[in-house]
Amino acid sequence: MGDWKGYISAVLRDQRIDDVAIVGHSDNRCVWASRPGGLLAAISPQEVGVLTGPDRHTFLQTGLSVAGRRCCVIRDYLLAEGDGVLDARTKGLDGRAICVGHTPRALLVLMGRRGVHGGILNKTVHDLIGGLREQCS
């Protein structure tokens, strides 16, 4: 998992993905790697805390922020055993799908291009976090 720059480049080869970030969630709640100049590089430690925190009820009702962009949560199985994915959509006219995948040490956050359905990102995140989990074990 050492070469995140190459990993980010590989993920961005998928033309449906506009932005990607790898974010620590256990010891170091910061962005480890992201698309240069991308919006997701601005994910804050507070946002990571909300995503991985025990209070799921509040952000399911009020939404959450990812890199300062307000989002509606569509599906939350981020902390569920065997799934580990949260689907959201940014609010506003330029609404985009956002999908967050959970691994033992990091979150993988993808933002789709305009018009890309969240289900496509969900499948991509499941595939990617499966590979990351295998590397960790």
From Swiss-Prot:
InterPro entries: PFN, PFN_euk, PFN_sf, Profilin1/2/3_vertebrate. One of its GO terms (biological process) is actin cytoskeleton organization. It comes from the Eukaryota. It is found in: Cytoplasm, Cytoskeleton; Nucleus; Cytoplasm. Its main location: cytoplasm. GO terms for molecular function: actin binding; lipid binding. GO terms for cellular component: cytoplasm; cytoskeleton; nucleus. The keyword Chaperone does not apply. Keywords: Actin-binding, Cytoplasm, Cytoskeleton, Lipid-binding, Nucleus. Detected in round spermatids. Belongs to the profilin family. Interacts with ACTRT3. Binds to actin and affects the structure of the cytoskeleton. Slightly reduces actin polymerization. Binds to poly-L-proline, phosphatidylinositol 3-phosphate (PtdIns(3)P), phosphatidylinositol 4,5-bisphosphate (PtdIns(4,5)P2), and phosphatidylinositol 4-phosphate (PtdIns(4)P). May be involved in spermatogenesis. This is Profilin-3. The gene is Pfn3.
